[in-house]
């Protein structure tokens, strides 16, 4: 044994111990560093690698009619997404083959037929990288179940579902512009969905899901994995009750469809309102759309013309001007008015609609037969200041404030800028622009005894816990006329239907009050568009104790275009169905004509009818044209329409020239141009 060998051994042992202490100390320090100093950071790193956080929303609130019948509802449904980073090629374990399985290609080929898309497009998504790509959102339950089965049967990685809310509009096109629609992120984009988005939008909660290194989901706290069915959850939701009556809305929608088919109008609007409360019972606009598939329709069809279209009202404005004259004491129903068929104001000549005069008649006859000359005389006596002041009192010139987006306020002159012709034309409903809702609201003030009401369409809003957070109620904005003036105008408007130009609105057994209107349409660049008209009718029933007030407006109907021809019959047919459906019994009413006795176009019975020329059907099917000279526009339309001939009119008054000329033989659907003066 070498000297000092023991000491060498002892030194080596000491050195080894020191090394062990250093190593253990290093490990302990590293553990302390990782477990204490870096603990939070490592936890977050682990969480980010093995979990993903997503937001789950509750279903959107319901929209129902006044009786609780659902119009817009939501259910929770599956939305499919991919995590391309987790879709790695792998060994084909299912078939026990020692080959690599192309997960991306297989997934694309299997899913494409169900998702109704191109497999190559899906493959491009799967190979594009990233951690989250939507494949299809808010799938139908049956479709989602098919995809779940494919994922489970083929053990596909990186494909998962999230629950999202899907909106259904149960009435399809009914009240489409009122309800509006939502986008893919559950955000209201139009109508009440937009206006009440804060109320209807569901709440959101963040959830996590756990997956393994290859993307297979281990635990779905919010996400439904392929082994579980996607089931809609029953949740307490906010509910918006509308003033709409679904039965009335259905009748109105059908009437509008029929009107558009018959008249080929460019657009239309109709509103039914409770004249004593301001509740909107029905509202329809054309063209329309199905909010379940709003993207398939033109944005023009999303517009609610009942509140957003402004137009010159024409003769339906005359009862408003008449109330001004009655209130100011300028006229009474019996005040004699001289009607010569035409009246000159400054450098402008204004004619009656048919160019004829009736001599001296009471003011009630001016309203009954819509005599322009009589209304112009009243307008000139009222003057610009009073015309505009009263128009504002009746609610024109400012939005009504209904709970719908996109409402227009109309257009009124500044009285300081009005010349005499402006005053004269405003008295007959020109030079003033209104919306259908504004016009109906003003007429309701006549129907209810003088109260200008705040129209409303939300009956109440009930929170998820049952608390009523808003409740609609009758609101009187102001009293615009006295009960006496309202009664006098109601009586005059009743004679419009029973004896005057609005006979086509009469419903046998019921007292109807109303007014027709036919106005030239404003051209985009100023002035009036040749041959384009707005045809309207506004009225209420029963005339003495109104239950329903209704306005019908047709934009540019083809062929017949007078309000008495196209709009009044819609009023009649719609309200007749509603009165029967609601059990409102007819009352004895002397003087109401039967349908057989009605003059089809509301001609003036007091006027001597001219002998009209005759069109001849030739053996070869062509139609021989007569000479239209001396006829008014209405008679010309009545002659052409049965032979399917179209009128393109120029000017107003009586015919003096035509093309093709008299004696020409033309085919059906030919357009006949006639110049009136």
Give the residues covered by each predicted segment:
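Juxtamembrane extramembrane loops of integral membrane proteins
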Residues: 54, 58-116
